Amino acid sequence: MPFKLKQALAGLVLSAVAMLPATALAQTVDEIIARGKLIVAVDTTTPPYGFLDADLKPTGFDIEVATKMGEALGVPVEFVTVTSPGRIPSLLTKQVDAVVSIFSITPARAIQVDYSIPYAGQSAVVIAPKSTAISGHADLVGKKVGLTRGTAEDGILTAAAEANPGIEILRFDDYASLLQAMVSGQIDAMGGGDYGEIYLKKSANGDDFEQKYKLKTFYFGIGVAKDNDDLRQWINTWLFTLKADGVLEALSMKYRNQPLPELPVF
């Protein structure tokens, strides 16, 4: 099934979830086990971290991490599909127990939610066709730059646009829409991760895409509700063992075809 159709179907799931009333969030590991399921927010429009397979089932790096978390708790995982802007609201409205969705750890987000220790990381970069000369923020002046709304690169490039008048920012609600805009020529450049299908495609003029310059390296944590220390501490312990046992490294090679970066701790 074409990826765009898969993404549209995922959007229907998101719409349905958005209409559901807030449920009673489990505050402890014991409560999750007693309830009999772990509820996790994921984004299925961000390959290789989250996407839909041929059977329309969520798969990817983040999906496997979330699945293994449920296995460690001895309960199945119920996935709630969100896009980047919906990650924090899914915790604030108590629809999910955790967010496993390339959720970069930032001080601004940590005001609203709590994070686990990092389990993965990637560089945010500016991407454009090879024929487009870009080496820094100043080269984006006069160009349309696409972003996924609510991502870490959104903040960086929005600040760059404020400091460099003439950069036009276009925001998209999911990675698939951003990707389509880049391929079709609706935008001149995009902010995104150093991964993904964009490098397998051609621009509207037949060019290959390439990374132009690095914005910053971000590290992903599992998000939980503020002050849910019982669950957060359990997740930290579990992630420690997952990394020590080589599971995270194996998942990185499976889905990203590259080893994990060195992960800081806090």
Name what the model sees in each region.
Residues 89, 102-111, 156-160, 181-216:
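A ligand-binding cleft/hinge motif common to bilobed small-molecule-binding domains
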Residues 26-102, 254:
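Extracytoplasmic small-molecule ligand-binding "clamshell" domains
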Residues 52-54, 66-75, 153-171, 201-205, ...:
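Ligand-binding cleft/hinge of the Venus flytrap
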Residues 67, 71, 76-139, 208-209, ...:
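Acidic, polar ligand-binding/catalytic clefts
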Residues 76-83, 147, 166-174:
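Short beta-strand-to-loop elements that line the ligand-binding cleft
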Residues 120-128, 198-240, 258-266:
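Periplasmic-binding protein-like
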Residues 28, 152-169, 208-211, 240-266:
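Ligand-binding clefts/hinges and TM-proximal coupling segments of bilobed small-molecule sensing domains
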Residues 63-72, 131, 138, 143-144, ...:
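Extended ligand-binding regions for polar small-molecule ligands
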